[in-house]
């Protein structure tokens, strides 16, 4: 039997919160949408673009309620949770539209409510539905989601898995200073705050090195060691894994038991409250991933992304909500895994990025033995920063993308100032993603993956109408994501 992730008291509080949400939903129908992502995948940009396109009548041909003209009004409203910071939509959209800079990434949880007035497509529903749906968007770091599996692991299991992973591939080099310090530590010695702090600092430095752009690894729990916030320096964040001898365990008052106690405190103080107060109350979820960056960084980054997706999908229980499950044990009934930055590819490769991500998800689902019902995959660009063109070279027409590289970007030895546009050949993904995974599985040292040019482009310049009103933010397949995530709730 798998270990329980929550206590009976936690379950009771979750059931009470779901009951309160259900009662509120009878008067004001609501869907709680979780938005998270792995390794700079663009959560803030996704939310900002989604809200901007709904508020400003964006081009959403695949979002049926808007395409059919059934949505009559869209507005922002006060969020229901006063203790949760508000997602600062106005600041983020100003950065995108006016300043043409990408907004800061998510470092803590935030929330935003957007409400749609609509006419139901069903005559029966028009009689009984209030014709209003509130979408509570809950934005949280992907590192927090990757912490949830820790609830089912004791300190020994966490230590064994983390230490074993640290000695594989590129992690072996990145973890060398931390592992050297760990091996030199006497776990039987008395608890020592300075030793604990040194180990925790070295462990956090290793996790940060794994996350850096040049590595782009995704499996990085405990996440709050990367984003400590107001818990920085607390005992609950001052711990690290330690190797335990096969026989016996250190006695009371030892460094080992000190670290074990702090690991359990991390779960109680950090992980459980997030699960109980936020995650367990979600109805729908989108997980954004930067699959292009992983491919660009090589086989280990792709394998690590698959490992992270396995851990992520194991957290969900996709399926249909019955009345009883809604009241007592809320179930996330739809999960979308979306590969971002589709605008970095020519449209001919969009379906290939989709297929690559779908294969990653299928492999993750197979590894954990869960059904794929309620899970969808797509490639998208929350904000389209490029346009497509063709150039002639040696008598052949080549598909290219055109955009404004960010200041400091270097392409083929040329450094850009953030003002000048350029055309680049983005590279190709394989038609059959299986060929890519076969190359990775071969285990051959130095195996080459598709060469994809990942360039950081500035957000696009938005044209204005004759009345001086800026058009909505351009995107790729954002409307399709909306349709999957909450289109059915507007039927």
Task: Please identify what each model-predicted range represents.
Residues 49-55, 150-155, 302, 351-357, ...:
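Short secondary-structure boundary/capping segments
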Residues 338-345, 378-390:
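Short, conserved secondary-structure transition motifs
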Residues 16-22, 26-27, 53-331, 346, ...:
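Switch- and interface-adjacent substructures of P-loop NTPase systems
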Residues 344-369:
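GTPase G-domain guanine-specificity segment
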């Amino acid at each position: 039997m798998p270990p329980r992730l929550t206590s009976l008291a936690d379950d009771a509080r979750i059931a009470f919160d779901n009951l309160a949400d259900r009662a509120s939903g009878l008067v004001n129908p609501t869907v709680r949408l979780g938005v998270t992502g792995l390794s700079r995948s663009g959560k803030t940009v996704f939310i900002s673009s989604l809200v901007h396109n709904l508020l400003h009548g964006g081009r959403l041909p695949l979002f049926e309620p808007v395409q059919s003209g059934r949505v009559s009004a869209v507005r922002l409203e006060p969020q229901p949770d006063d203790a949760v910071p508000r997602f600062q939509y106005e600041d983020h959209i100003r950065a995108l539209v006016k300043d043409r800079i990408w907004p800061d990434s998510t470092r803590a949880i935030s929330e935003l409510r957007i409400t749609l007035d609509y006419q139901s497509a069903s005559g029966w529903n028009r009689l009984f539905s209030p014709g209003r749906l509130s979408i509570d968007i809950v934005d949280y770091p992907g590192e927090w989601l990757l912490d949830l599996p820790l609830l089912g692991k004791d300190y020994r299991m966490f230590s064994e898995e983390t230490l074993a992973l640290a000695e594989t591939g590129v992690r072996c080099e990145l973890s060398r200073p931390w592992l050297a310090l760990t091996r030199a530590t006497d776990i039987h010695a008395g608890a020592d705050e300075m030793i604990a702090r040194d180990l925790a600092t070295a462990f956090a430095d290793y996790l940060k090195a794994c996350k850096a752009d040049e590595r782009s690894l995704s499996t990085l729990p405990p996440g709050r060691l990367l984003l400590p916030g107001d818990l920085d320096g607390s005992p609950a964040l001052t711990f690290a894994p330690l190797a335990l001898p096969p026989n016996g365990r250190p006695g009371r008052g030892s460094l080992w038991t000190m670290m074990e106690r702090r690991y359990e405190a991390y779960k109680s103080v950090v992980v459980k409250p997030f699960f109980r107060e936020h995650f367990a109350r979600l109805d729908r979820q989108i997980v954004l991933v930067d699959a292009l960056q992983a491919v660009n960084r090589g086989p280990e980054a792709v394998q690590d992304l698959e490992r992270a997706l396995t851990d992520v999908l194991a957290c969900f229980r996709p399926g249909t909500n019955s009345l009883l499950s809604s009241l007592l044990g809320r179930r996330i009934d739809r999960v979308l895994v979306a590969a971002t930055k589709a605008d970095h590819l020519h449209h001919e490769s969009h379906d290939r990025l989709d297929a690559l991500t779908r294969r990653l998800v299928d492999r993750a689902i197979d590894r954990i033995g869960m059904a794929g019902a309620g899970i969808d995959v797509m490639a998208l660009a929350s904000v389209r920063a490029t346009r497509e063109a063709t150039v002639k070279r040696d008598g052949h027409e080549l598909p290219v993308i055109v955009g404004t590289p960010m200041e400091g970007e270097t392409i083929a030895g040329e450094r850009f100032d953030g003002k000048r546009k350029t055309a680049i050949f983005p590279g190709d993904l394989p038609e059959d993603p299986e060929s890519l995974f076969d190359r990775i599985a071969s285990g051959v040292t130095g195996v080459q993956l598709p060469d994809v040019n990942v360039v950081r482009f500035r957000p696009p310049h938005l044209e204005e109408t004759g009345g001086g009103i800026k058009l909505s933010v351009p995107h790729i397949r954002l409307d399709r994501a909306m349709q999957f995530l909450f289109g059915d709730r507007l039927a």
